[in-house]
């Protein structure tokens, strides 16, 4: 499976790789506020959706046969109290593969891509109890599943040398297609949980501006479209790196502007929180809250009329688990509600604790946070934290060696 990489895609993918993967942990680590999902292996999980009965669906990859083994698709359904409802490990895929991009269909069937990161992406269908519901939908090896909703799949690929997006139903029937990666004639992503596609990203290949638009149902027509003016002097390229639906029907988005004439390295990235209404009109922006504390945005999350922003310090030790991380809370109307400082103690994770002390002189070991996702649950907000220990030989630019990995869920204090 090959996709033509462009300047726009590189920029927006790099932004997510660097920023979505940092940020945050949570409150006290007593038993009722923390649950360990995996220890030791380099497993990972992503939050996909909440089922109608309050259970949550997680998908990802599980490593088999130690650190040198392959990943296999891993699906976990957790009850509202975070006990396991059911779990599936699919060993039928050849080579390393993962599960991802899931949706609950109108008849209650759960559709999941169980071939992610391979050249044979397959949609499998399950009942709410994890049993097979119907035959698989095998996709073209030249496509990538970008999004899954109850009524369609959004796929991207290269056709005649051009990047394009196609929407299909769960029988494999094409609904419509257009040029561009998710965003028509641009590069971007889709807002999760929208029946009518709302897509956002960048026009990096043309004027470099950030854009968000809503498509009309299953037709390739725009209901509305908003192109953002550059907010800073000397901005070269702008992108909406993430957008989520808010409780008032609008959207909260992370805008990144890259200014290539500032900063020690010749450029500077500036992050801005933007709130759109349901018609795509800008209601407010906020960059000062992050600028004053030398922070970038790591992820945006909407929950019960509030917007939570996972913040990343611009300092070099932003990954270090020993330093507190920050979540800033805003109301949908733009009022800053306060901050939550989060810290997870590596000494309280038994599998990680044994790796904290270096075995050889001249090496250092650092407990680190790799990724955090906020998940809405019946008893509040929880964080799914991926963390571990890295060993470095102490030389400048030396390679780090992975030593331990934990997947933990932790309760988050709200503001």
PLM segments and residue spans:
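An edge-strand/N-cap motif at the start of beta-rich repeat modules
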Residues: 30-62
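Aromatic (tryptophan-biased) beta-strands that constitute blades/sheets of beta-rich domains
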Residues: 32-44, 74, 83-92, 132-138, ...
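Repeated scaffold domains used in trafficking and secretory/extracellular systems
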Residues: 42-49, 95-104, 138-148, 181-192, ...
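Short coil/turn segments that connect the beta-strands within blades of beta-propeller domains
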Residues: 53-54, 107-108, 150-151, 194-197, ...
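Recurrent small/Gly-Pro-centered beta-turn motifs in extracellular repeat architectures
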Residues: 58-62, 112-116, 155-158, 199-204, ...
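Short, solvent-exposed loop/turn segments at conserved positions within beta-propeller repeat blades
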Residues: 66-71, 116-120, 158-162, 204-209, ...
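A short loop-to-beta-strand structural motif that recurs across blades of beta-propeller domains
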Residues: 72-76, 121-124, 163-166, 209-213, ...
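Blade-level signature of beta-propeller repeat domains, shared across WD40, Kelch, NHL, RCC1
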Residues: 372-415
């Amino acid at each position: 499976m090959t996709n033509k990489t462009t300047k726009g895609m590189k920029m927006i993918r790099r932004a997510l790789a660097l920023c979505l993967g940092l940020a945050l942990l949570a409150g006290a680590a007593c038993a009722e506020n923390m649950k360990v999902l995996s220890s030791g292996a380099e497993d990972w999980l992503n939050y996909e959706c909440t089922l109608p009965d309050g259970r949550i669906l997680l998908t990802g990859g599980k490593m088999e046969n130690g650190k040198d083994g392959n990943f296999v698709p891993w699906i976990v359904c957790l009850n509202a109290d975070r006990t396991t409802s059911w779990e599936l490990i699919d060993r039928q895929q050849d080579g390393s593969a993962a599960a991802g991009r899931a949706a609950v269909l109108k008849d209650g069937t759960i559709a999941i891509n169980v071939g992610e990161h391979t050249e044979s992406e397959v949609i499998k269908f399950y009942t709410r109890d994890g049993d097979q519901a119907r035959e698989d939908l095998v996709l073209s090896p030249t496509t990538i599943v970008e999004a899954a909703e109850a009524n369609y799949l959004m796929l991207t690929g290269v056709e005649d040398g051009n990047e394009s997006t196609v929407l299909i139903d769960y029988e494999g029937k094409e609904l419509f297609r257009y040029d561009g990666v998710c965003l028509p004639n641009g590069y971007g992503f889709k807002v999760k949980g929208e029946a009518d596609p709302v897509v956002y990203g960048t026009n990096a290949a043309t004027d470099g501006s950030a854009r968000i638009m809503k498509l009309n149902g299953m037709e390739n027509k725009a209901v509305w479209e908003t192109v953002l003016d550059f907010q800073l002097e000397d901005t070269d390229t702008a992108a909406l790196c993430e957008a989520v639906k808010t409780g008032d029907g609008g959207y909260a988005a992370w805008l990144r502007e890259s200014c290539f004439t500032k900063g020690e390295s010749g450029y500077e990235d500036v992050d801005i929180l933007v709130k759109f209404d349901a018609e795509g009109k800008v209601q407010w922006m906020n960059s000062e809250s992050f600028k004053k504390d030398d922070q970038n945005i790591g992820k945006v999350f909407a929950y019960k009329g509030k917007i939570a922003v996972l913040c990343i310090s611009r300092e070099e030790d932003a990954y270090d688990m020993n330093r507190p991380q920050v979540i800033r809370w805003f109301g949908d109307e733009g009022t800053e509600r306060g901050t939550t400082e989060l810290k997870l103690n590596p000494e309280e994770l038994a599998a990680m604790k044994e790796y904290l002390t270096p075995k050889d002189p001249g090496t250092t070991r650092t407990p680190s946070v790799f990724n955090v996702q906020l998940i809405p649950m019946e008893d509040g907000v929880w964080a799914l934290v991926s963390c571990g220990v890295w060993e470095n030989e102490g030389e400048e630019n030396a390679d780090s060696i992975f030593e331990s990995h934990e997947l933990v869920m932790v309760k988050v204090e709200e503001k």
